[in-house]
Amino acid sequence: MKSTRSALFLTLALAATPALAQQNLNTISDDLVARAGQAYGNLDTVSGDIAIQAGSSVRNVNTVSGDIDLAEGATTARLETVSGDIEGGRKITASAGVGTVSGDIFFDHGSRIGGDLESVSGDIGLVGTRASGGIETVSGDITVGAGSHVKGGIRIEKPNGSWGLRIGNRKPPRIVIGPNAVVEGALVFERPVALYVHSSAKIGRVSGATARSFDTPTAPKD
């Protein structure tokens, strides 16, 4: 009887495995789609775009030049691309952070980012979003928009090596901390920037720049 039960349990476990496994999707140039409400493993492509539909769950998402688009309520761990853009709708969760080299990053109301948001030359924008880490870039613009909360700080690194030659002549990055936004950590600028902080915003210590206050819905143009 004991051996029969063991065999039965083994059969049931093997039968359940395919249903429990999360599917990995990989392509070179084709686009990938994570269907609404479904769970996936890793999504990887070189030049194809990746669309994560509403309510779907994906482990890690990686592209080289493709864009990553996340619909409302999508959940992921890590999002990474080299030159593609990452655009998140409302209530996105990225539990292990977000990174690009030259692609732009944006998240809308109700989104939660675990870890850092990082780029070399891409712009980073948040509206009504909470980030448990910080924001780092070299030459990209940063907007911590209305109602956003960044627990870490903001760091603009000094260009060096080949990156310094490529971006050394660009205009200073534009950093905007919008209405009712909070940046708990230090704001450290290793190169010149244009820093605008709304009168209702709360920020940590600033080094390397002088903040310009504004009380209009949007920051002044440079």
What is the predicted role of each segment?
Residues M1-D222:
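Intrinsically disordered, low-complexity terminal regions
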